[in-house]
Amino acid sequence: MRTSQYLLSTLKETPADAEVISHQLMLRAGMIRKLASGLYTWLPTGLRVLKKVENIVREEMNNAGAIEVSMPVVQPADLWQESGRWEQYGPELLRFVDRGERPFVLGPTHEEVITDLVRNELSSYKQLPLNFFQIQTKFRDEVRPRFGVMRSREFLMKDAYSFHTSQESLQETYDAMYAAYSRIFSRMGLDFRAVQADTGSIGGNASHEFQVLAQSGEDDIVFSDVSDYAANIELAEAIAPQTPRAAATQEMTLVDTPNAKTIAELVEQFNLPIEKTVKTLLVKAAKDSKSTLVALLVRGDHELNEVKAEKLPHVASPLTFATEEEIRAVINAGPGSLGPVNMPIPVIIDRTVAAMSDFAAGANIDGKHYFGINWDRDVATPVVADIRNVVAGDPSPDGEGTLLIKRGIEVGHIFQLGTKYSEALKASVQGEDGRNQILTMGCYGIGVTRVVAAAIEQNFDERGIVWPDAIAPFQVAILPMNMHKSFRVQELAEKLYSELRAQGIEVLMDDRKERPGVMFADMELIGIPHTIVIGDRNLDNDDIEYKYRRSGKKSLIKTGDIVDYLVKAIKG
């Protein structure tokens, strides 16, 4: 490709509304342009990267035995009503009616459509297992689209759905998809972790997320410094303290704390170690509970894990924090003065809190706290559960090493769905025993557009994008200096351009009448891995300057050797 016949569209300045580096660089490198909130046009450079990501995904899905299909973006509402998600899904589901007043949705996902297809096409266990995939546009009406294509409303996704007559069969496919995803992200040159995850609104049993490590990530991922253990922080178990609870050394004392409504204020004003404080959070109780509220207690320096808390039998789902009005109606004190002593509602404490002694907590009286509280002396030990987020340095749940925490961008997610959708849509086949058998499902997603942004978040420097070779828009950039004034520069550039293309190498030759500084800046911004610079001065010695984008290393290579050198560097 020649720049004179190409839409380069690079920008010198960073757009003001671009928050994260991937959004900034995708705009500056001429990869995307915003059409409306959360909607982007992919320009040629961006589309080349997107297609490479898509091709790697497709190759590995085919290698894993999945079958490609294509399902409509527009879906009839009756399928969503049949599955129950018409009512469950929030405003992210874009609903509309056609000219005949028939309701439809723009698909955010395709569980209903594929299950409908299978229930009409399959009739016998002999046809299973099957794993269908597509690479298709999705639409989710995000309340606040941000970070460019990282969280856009319209996006490209690879979604796959497998169907089985046994859990063993599902597990085999699940393991195959796990391995395929690992190959996909490895081939793309990404630093990623596969982590245990919560199944969330999708439902089902087992679940793993594939997270690309990046400081801009929205998820905290946890992994052992010794073993292969890794999990989303939502799911990571906080191990109970291994040392026994220390004996009481203080008497419980009621203390006036009128200006201490938070743990931070309590610690600062009374010079308390934060590890000796407890915070109390009140949430709505489950419908079948005798109480309207439940008290959850975590250590002052720990954070409540809302996913864990929501799964407790006494707690309402979704987790809902009580308002101050609701708290005062039950406790007669504000949220800054709550604690376990004389608490009139059910109390659940974290494992770490259960191991505490001589601690401070609210007295359930405005402006007062108890200091020197001890379990079983001042208040009975209540229900104990793992309800906090782990912190760096905690022991790994598998007993090997300690935990590290890094930020991650979720680019893939696999689920064992079980029978949630097949039961709702009555998808069954005749089993081996002749009886009707509801199908067991798995689903497996990759955010194809998000992968592009995540790759940039991991691969950039002060000059621009530093693409992994496998997904770069071009493999080689040819920069002929003053080619319009030097016949030998132009002649060699054209010769190398033809020879490299004949070797199947993707080349961008900058044949613009531009200053060298502009040409260098654009190629580094775009992030092409290999650059060759052809200039009269080096040609006097029969040399070409070669530069590898990732290392920045430059070297002089003889003109007769450069093609073989590049072929070897690119193809191995």
From Swiss-Prot:
It is found in: Cytoplasm. Homodimer. The keyword Nucleotide-binding applies. Catalyzes the attachment of proline to tRNA(Pro) in a two-step reaction: proline is first activated by ATP to form Pro-AMP and then transferred to the acceptor end of tRNA(Pro). As ProRS can inadvertently accommodate and process non-cognate amino acids such as alanine and cysteine, to avoid such errors it has two additional distinct editing activities against alanine. One activity is designated as 'pretransfer' editing and involves the tRNA(Pro)-independent hydrolysis of activated Ala-AMP. HAMAP family: Pro_tRNA_synth_type1. Consists of three domains: the N-terminal catalytic domain, the editing domain and the C-terminal anticodon-binding domain. This is Proline--tRNA ligase. GO terms for molecular function: aminoacyl-tRNA deacylase activity; ATP binding; proline-tRNA ligase activity. GO terms for cellular component: cytosol. The keyword Nucleotide-binding applies. It holds the Pfam family tRNA_edit. Belongs to the class-II aminoacyl-tRNA synthetase family. ProS type 1 subfamily. It is an enzyme of class 6 (ligase). Its EC number is 6.1.1.15. It comes from the Bacteria. It catalyses: tRNA(Pro) + L-proline + ATP = L-prolyl-tRNA(Pro) + AMP + diphosphate.
